[in-house]
Design a protein with these regions (language model features):
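Alpha-helical recognition/docking segments in bacterial nutrient-uptake
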Residues: 1, 5, 62-175, 179, ...
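N-terminal helix-turn-helix DNA-binding module of bacterial transcription factors
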Residues: 1-63
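Aromatic/hydrophobic pocket-lining residues that form π-stacking "cages" and hydrophobic walls in ligand
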Residues: 6, 41, 86, 173, ...
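Hinge/beta->alpha junction and helix N-cap segments in small-molecule ligand-binding domains
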Residues: 71-80, 100-108, 130, 161-172, ...
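Glycosyltransferases and closely related glycan-assembly transferases
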Residues: 137-146, 205-209, 260-269
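Flexible loop/turn connectors
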Residues: 238-327
Length: 327
């Protein structure tokens, strides 16, 4: 079967080969292609099943249209859901993503970073840099990088990043629960040394204070760093915080932990309101409400910072949204 060439696509779309190359391979910035011609070129490429020669495109000075994304392989639903939105929005912008999965290993991240650049990836989104004990290594890896944007504040000063906040949503959640008679608010979160967990801890206490209530550290349980199993962590939370302190309302960000705690509470016939935070579909099955982290807005902001460097003089802040759970 004869291989489809760029010339074949150009002929079907009734445009020049250079115009077709600009749309499909990146081409020179000196070449301008109108919206109607672009549509004809893309339609022709689909009909002919044209495959871009990536190596040739890069050598010719074109844009690979590839975005690299670093993800921690131990990441919970929140990060995986964000990756889905990054991929979906990238596709609408004419880009594809290549994902690097690793955990707690800067050496692997460095190898992937170098390899993906050899493949022509020109921009990266990093969602795997929140390692408190590896800050020196993270700084060394990205010290000279000007093609990386970060999800949450990195340990490198001045680098572009998108920040998220639950403060407003948590404040509204607690206010709504207070109107329904709840008074003792507890939460559970991961290892406190990680900046993202520090932020959750701080914002939860701030939301308590904003509602005129007393902040009580005894109602906050930190999962042991050495234990990863959600069921074991839930049992420890029951033993160390829930049973001794008896909160009447629990904010649990992740649905797996919420399900584990809910199961233990039901077995012991202890009534307690639980509210989630990462909007995982499992919450619906559990009958538990959840905050909306606004994943699409986060992904859009990350891509905007990456693809438009002129927008990097500000830090986008994406606020989670409280959806009244009722009852």
């Amino acid at each position: 079967m004869k291989k489809v060439t760029l010339t074949d696509v150009a002929r079907m779309a009734n445009v020049s080969s250079s115009a077709a190359g600009k749309v499909l391979n990146g081409g020179s910035d000196q070449i301008r292609v109108g919206a109607e011609a672009r549509k004809r070129i893309l339609d022709a490429a689909r009909k002919l099943d044209y495959r871009t020669n990536m190596a040739a495109s890069i050598l010719a000075g074109g844009n690979s249209r590839l975005i690299g994304v670093f993800i921690d392989s131990f990441a919970a639903y929140r990060t995986r859901r964000l990756l889905q939105e990054i991929e979906r929005l990238s596709q609408t912008l004419g880009y594809r993503i290549i994902t690097s999965f690793t955990h707690d290993c800067i050496a692997n991240m460095r190898e992937d970073y170098l390899m993906l650049q050899r493949y022509g990836v020109s921009g990266f989104i990093c969602c795997a840099h929140d390692y408190p004990h590896l800050r020196k290594e993270v700084r060394a890896l990205f010290a000279e990088a000007d093609n990386v944007v970060f999800m949450e504040k990195p340990c490198l000063p001045g680098r572009p990043y998108v920040r998220t906040s639950r403060l407003r949503a948590l404040t509204e959640m607690i206010a709504d629960a207070g109107r329904r008679g709840f008074r003792r608010f507890g939460t559970m979160h991961d290892w406190h040394a990680a900046p993202t967990e520090q932020t959750l801890h701080r914002e939860f206490l701030q939301a308590i204070l904003a509602n005129g209530l007393e902040a009580n550290e005894k109602l906050i349980f930190e999962y042991p760093k050495s234990i990863r199993d959600p069921g074991v962590r839930a049992r420890l939370a029951m033993e160390k915080m829930i049973l001794p302190q008896r909160p009447d309302f629990l904010y649990i960000d992740d649905a797996l932990y919420a399900a584990s705690v809910q199961s233990l509470l039901l077995k012991q016939r202890i009534p307690m309101m639980i509210h989630g935070g990462n909007d995982e579909p499992l919450f619906n099955g559990l009958g538990i409400g959840s905050l909306d982290p606004c994943y699409e807005k986060i992904a859009a902001s990350l891509l905007d910072l990456l693809l438009h460097p002129e927008a990097r003089n500000t830090v986008p802040i994406i606020e989670a949204v409280y959806k009244n759970a009722g009852g």
